[in-house]
Amino acid sequence: MAASSNSSLSGSSVSSDAEEYQPPIWKSYLYQLQQEAPRPKRIICPREVENRPKYYGREFHGIISREQADELLGGVEGAYILRESQRQPGCYTLALRFGNQTLNYRLFHDGKHFVGEKRFESIHDLVTDGLITLYIETKAAEYISKMTTNPIYEHIGYATLLREKVSRRLSRSKNEPRKTNVTHEEHTAVEKISSLVRRAALTHNDNHFNYEKTHNFKVHTFRGPHWCEYCANFMWGLIAQGVRCSDCGLNVHKQCSKHVPNDCQPDLKRIKKVYCCDLTTLVKAHNTQRPMVVDICIREIEARGLKSEGLYRVSGFTEHIEDVKMAFDRDGEKADISANVYPDINIITGALKLYFRDLPIPVITYDTYSKFIDAAKISNADERLEAVHEVLMLLPPAHYETLRYLMIHLKKVTMNEKDNFMNAENLGIVFGPTLMRPPEDSTLTTLHDMRYQKLIVQILIENEDVLF
């Protein structure tokens, strides 16, 4: 009887006029059915029942048979009692009258009452929600099964809004596009690898700027009437009527959530901090190509720290690095990390490394980790480079763009090796475990893979001009 509010869409009439936005017609059929659903009628026991559980009220009738319960309900729709099982003492049953029959449900209590997934504060709420669900699923089973077939989601404006934001982002990114024209120096570098790798490495792929993000749906209890923003149908029940995206606030039926496109546009008000936030979620929320932390820190480092000895290898004071982290979490892009506030450049490099370490999903994602490790194990240099490039193409767009930008920066660091003593191998040692972590939290795996992590970052830095 767990009232599952999984639903979908039946035919909706939507204006075809693309030039003028028309609000969707919210469908009232399921709302009307909820209003018509039988109301719970508690059948009170006229006597005091010994050993009645403290969390049950006078609807508890003690140890009685199914036949006695049926007689007490008297054929009244929505009537209910609680009883203790004759066959299994200590087990409790909800007897409920619906559809001209008595339905019996095993009843549980763990601080809240439940017969399925939903937890209720009171038996009255449990029965009310159950009657609504039974009534709607009995009266509208076919209607519910067809709800997702003709969604109004596109017409509400989410997809249009997304396309506009992507267009604006693309227009801004024209100042820093992926490389499509090969200079003489790049041509010389490309000759180092096979023609197959060269063709793949220099292929322009606009999809990397079309950042897709899945919605982060979680079961939600809506206070007051709510309608699904995918199918436009009412979200029935008292609690857990549907799901809400915790990043953008989209409200839909659980069933409809399976059909929503990966077009989450996070709301800044819902993003509590910068550090420890999913990379794609952060860039979508701020409508940027890369996390602001990466851009701001790298600009500061390149402005005053490229010649600093041991750059990225030397650690800054932990307390000051935490201060930078808090500044970004508090002030966002307005965080002041200038030399006036943090004269030691190692604090800024430490803050950048900390950002990468704190990512829930590393820059080199868990999904691609083993593929990168396998690529690093290839002995032939050309084949290894080709394999690395193929795996790069599997990274989510925001992760790819962040990695690309970081590698361009680290290449600049190596160009100042005579001053900072940091070559690609040294940077690989620093950034290998920072940018890529094994999916399983195994110390043995981490230690075994460290040399391959280092090698991958080293390859990315040394071949930045042909891999990205």
Swiss-Prot record:
Matches recorded under PROSITE patterns: RHOGAP (PS50238), SH2 (PS50001), ZF_DAG_PE_1 (PS00479), ZF_DAG_PE_2 (PS50081)
Membrane topology term: Peripheral membrane protein
Record-level GO cellular component terms: cytosol; membrane; synapse
Tissues expressing this chain: Highest levels in the brain and pancreas. Also expressed in the heart, placenta, and weakly in the kidney and liver. Expression is much reduced in the malignant gliomas, compared to normal brain or low-grade astrocytomas.
InterPro entries recorded: C1-like_sf, Chimaerin_SH2, CHN1/CHN2, DAG/PE-bd, PE/DAG-bd, Rho-type_GAP, Rho_GTPase_activation_prot, RhoGAP_chimaerin
Gene3D superfamilies the record matches: 3.30.60.20, Rho GTPase activation protein, SH2 domain
Site (Arginine finger): 313
Zinc finger feature spans (Phorbol-ester/DAG-type): 214-264
Biased composition annotated in UniProt, kind: Low complexity: 1-16
Control of this protein's activity: In the inactive state, the N terminus protrudes into the active site of the Rho-GAP domain, sterically blocking Rac binding. Phospholipid binding to the Phorbol-ester/DAG-type zinc-finger/C1 domain triggers the cooperative dissociation of these interactions, allowing the N-terminus to move out of the active site and thereby activating the enzyme.
Residue ranges of domain SH2 in the record: 59-127
Top-level taxonomic group: Eukaryota
Keywords: GTPase activation, Membrane, Metal-binding, SH2 domain, Zinc, Zinc-finger
Keyword rRNA processing: no
Domain Rho-GAP stretches: 277-468
Chain segments carrying region Disordered: 1-20
Xref: Pfam families: C1_1, RhoGAP, SH2
Gene Ontology terms, MF aspect: GTPase activator activity; zinc ion binding
Role: GTPase-activating protein for p21-rac. Insufficient expression of beta-2 chimaerin is expected to lead to higher Rac activity and could therefore play a role in the progression from low-grade to high-grade tumors.
PANTHER family according to UniProt: BETA-CHIMAERIN (PTHR46075:SF4), CHIMERIN FAMILY MEMBER (PTHR46075)
Protein name: Beta-chimaerin
Taxonomic lineage from the root: Eukaryota, Metazoa, Chordata, Craniata, Vertebrata
Gene behind the chain: CHN2
